[in-house]
A protein has these predicted regions:
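Glycine-rich ThDP/TPP pyrophosphate-binding loop and its adjacent helix/strand module
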Residues: 1-155
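C-terminal intrinsically disordered, low-complexity extensions immediately downstream
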Residues: 155-172
Length: 172
């Protein structure tokens, strides 16, 4: 589906921003051992579209700025684009996965020090003089929004099976 979507988006110059969250693993396999690519955004060249990699996608401000640039490019009618965000999956891939034992402990420790939420809190305090109380208010508000969204999803009706294929284009 990825290649077909990118090919059609490029062919029709669709305003599509494809974001690849590269956490370096395909379930438990290190992607760097599975491909000769250093960056997945280089796949964009095969579709004749631009691809950009954010090497430190744990910096929230950098991700925001690069996403805004990419969105502006796409919205301006230039066609699709790939934006790769290199980050780290701190937990396992799925509940039935055996944790993160397959990861290099030194690399895991290095990335855990770069937790995006902690880095953003530090940046807000150091560069913007945001106080601990304000950070706590933000965290509490986000937690409340998540709880409300979860509660809504728990009681929301399931979609009807007969509409599952609505708006799906299949050119077979």
């Amino acid at each position: 589906p990825f290649y077909e979507a990118m090919n059609m988006a490029a062919a029709f110059k669709l305003p599509m921003l494809m974001i690849i969250q590269n956490n370096f693993f395909a379930i438990s396999e290190d992607f760097r051992k599975m491909t000769g690519l250093q960056s997945l955004s280089t796949r964009a060249a095969g579709f004749g579209i631009p691809g950009v990699t954010v090497e430190n996608a744990n910096d929230v401000e950098t991700v925001y700025n690069e996403t805004m640039k990419a969105a502006e490019y796409v919205r301006a009618g230039n066609g699709p684009m790939i934006l790769e965000l290199k980050t780290w999956r701190q937990m396992g891939h799925a509940p039935n996965e055996p944790g993160t034992k397959y990861k290099d402990p030194a690399e895991q420790a290095m990335w855990l020090k770069r937790d995006p939420i902690k880095l953003l809190a530090t940046k807000l305090k150091e560069q913007y003089q945001v106080q601990d109380e304000q950070i706590k208010e933000i965290e509490d508000r986000v937690e409340q929004e998540l709880d409300e969204a979860w509660a809504f999803a728990e009681v929301a009706p399931y979609s009807l099976p007969e509409v599952a294929m609505d708006h799906i284009y299949a050119g077979c």
